[in-house]
């Protein structure tokens, strides 16, 4: 109970600090540190008129350095849309990425652009970017899907608010960046020579690797990477293992190779099989494709 109260008190304090910063023209960094003076934050009312938010978006094709292969698909490009939300001269940036094999869940380029046009037409009704929950709830209500487009707006809005407060979000949330989990670098399925090259490129820059599996060359992939580095490895099978006994055998073998976690070992429709694998696995098993929205988590109880 104390933890819940502490979290609520932290939220209340951060909210108060943010508005204190806005009212005084101080950055939230200075308010949190108790400083009495700081560079001007931004002018809420430059021209005597309350500013409105504006949204812009720019579709483009992201070209990859290497062919990127997962269990069911290979690609050399990714359809993308850059999203910008501007408020009083400050711009927050977001991105909608639509890998072809996930477009049923995330949306296509056409559907993303159509949804962002809807948002562009209505976002001006909000004059306060700090109403994050209200704005994002309203945008979510505009359609049942369009996850990629909604994510891009969410990211851009948070980026905007962080810039308005002149603070990164780990500070706004009261976190210690030194305690943040390490991010992974993903290595797609490929030939041994290419996998070896990719591993050499990234091994000195990251604390943990993420490796795509789910095809017949899974063991060759891991053996090749292990010939280059002994870094911890997270595995993402992208639903590629169809048989639960095969999946469990692979997980036991992977544990011997220093793998630390397994992501989405089997198709999301095979919930009973995934639950069986999770219950037997010597490594933690995480969902990926099985969770697109918060409501999906309920269906994964005990899985």
Locations of the language-model features?
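N-terminal export signals
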Residues: 5-6, 12-34
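Catalytic beta/alpha-barrel core
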Residues: 188, 208-215, 238-239, 259-268, ...
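Catalytic alpha/beta core domains of metabolic enzymes, predominantly
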Residues: 269-274, 278-303
């Amino acid at each position: 109970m104390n933890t819940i109260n502490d979290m609520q008190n932290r939220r209340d304090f951060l909210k108060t600090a943010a508005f204190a910063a806005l009212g005084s023209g101080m950055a939230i960094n200075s308010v949190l540190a108790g400083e009495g003076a700081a560079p001007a934050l931004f002018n809420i009312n430059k021209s005597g008129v309350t500013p409105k938010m504006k949204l812009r978006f720019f579709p483009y094709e992201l070209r990859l350095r290497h062919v990127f292969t997962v269990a069911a698909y290979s690609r050399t490009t990714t359809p993308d849309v850059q999203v910008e939300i501007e408020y009083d001269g400050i711009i927050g940036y977001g991105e909608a990425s639509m890998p072809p094999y996930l477009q049923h869940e995330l949306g296509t380029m056409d559907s993303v652009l159509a949804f962002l046009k809807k948002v562009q037409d209505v976002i001006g009704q909000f004059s306060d970017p700090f109403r994050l929950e209200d704005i994002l709830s309203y945008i979510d209500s505009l359609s049942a899907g369009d996850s990629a487009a909604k994510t891009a707006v969410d990211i851009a809005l948070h980026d905007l608010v962080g810039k308005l407060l002149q603070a990164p979000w780990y500070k706004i949330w009261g976190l210690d960046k030194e305690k943040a989990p390490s991010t992974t670098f993903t290595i797609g399925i490929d030939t041994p020579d290419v996998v070896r090259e990719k591993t050499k490129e990234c091994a000195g820059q990251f604390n943990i690797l993420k490796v795509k599996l789910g095809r017949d060359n899974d063991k060759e992939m891991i053996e090749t990477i292990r010939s280059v580095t002994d870094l911890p490895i997270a595995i993402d099978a992208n639903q590629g293992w169809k048989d639960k006994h095969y999946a469990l055998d692979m997980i036991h073998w992977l544990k011997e190779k220093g793998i630390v976690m397994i992501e989405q070992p089997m198709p999301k429709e095979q919930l009973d099989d995934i639950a069986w694998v999770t219950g037997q696995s010597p490594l933690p098993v995480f969902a990926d494709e099985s969770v697109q929205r918060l409501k999906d988590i309920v269906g994964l109880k005990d899985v």
